[in-house]
C-alpha cells in the first residue's frame, strides 16, 4: 500500500530516517511548520503536524490528520477535513513536561531564584 505522508513537525535527521524506515512503502515529505506549501498539503494522504487550516481544507482525499497539539478544534469544523478522515492529537503528550515546568517555575518564584540569578549576572558584567 503506497501512501503519501506530509510531516510538518520539527524532526532531526535521525527521526526522519526512523520514520521513513518504519514504513518504506510510504513516500514522505518533510516541511518546517513555517514553510508548508499548498502543493505539499494537496499531495498528501496523511498529514502529521499542524499545517494551516486554509491549506488542509482544500485536500479532499486526506485520510489521516495528526494534530501536534492537544486541541485540534480548528480542524474539526465542518468542511475542513473529509468525513472519513481519521483525526488524532497529542492529548496528554505534554502533561508531564508542563507539570515539571510549572513546579520549577513555582519553586523559582517562591525562593526568589530569578532575583538571585539577576544579581549574579550583574556582578559578572
Regions found by a protein language model. Name each.
Residues 1-88:
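An N-terminal-biased, well-structured beta-alpha scaffold segment characteristic
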Residues 83-125:
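Phosphate-binding beta-alpha-beta segment of Rossmann-like dinucleotide-binding domains, i.e.
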Amino acid at each position: 500500500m503506497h501512501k503519501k505522508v506530509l510531516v510538518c513537525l520539527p524532526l532531526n535527521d535521525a527521526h526522519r530516517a526512523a520514520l521513513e524506515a518504519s514504513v518504506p512503502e510510504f513516500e514522505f515529505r518533510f516541511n518546517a511548520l513555517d514553510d508548508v506549501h499548498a502543493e505539499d498539503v494537496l499531495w498528501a494522504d496523511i498529514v502529521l503536524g499542524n499545517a494551516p487550516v486554509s491549506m488542509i481544507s482544500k485536500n479532499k482525499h486526506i485520510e489521516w490528520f495528526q494534530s501536534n497539539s492537544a486541541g485540534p478544534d480548528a480542524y474539526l469544523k465542518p468542511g475542513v477535513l473529509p468525513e472519513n478522515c481519521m483525526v488524532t492529537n497529542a492529548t496528554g503528550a505534554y502533561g508531564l513536561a508542563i507539570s515539571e515546568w510549572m513546579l520549577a517555575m513555582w519553586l523559582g518564584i517562591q525562593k526568589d531564584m530569578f532575583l538571585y540569578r539577576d544579581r549574579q549576572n550583574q556582578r559578572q558584567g
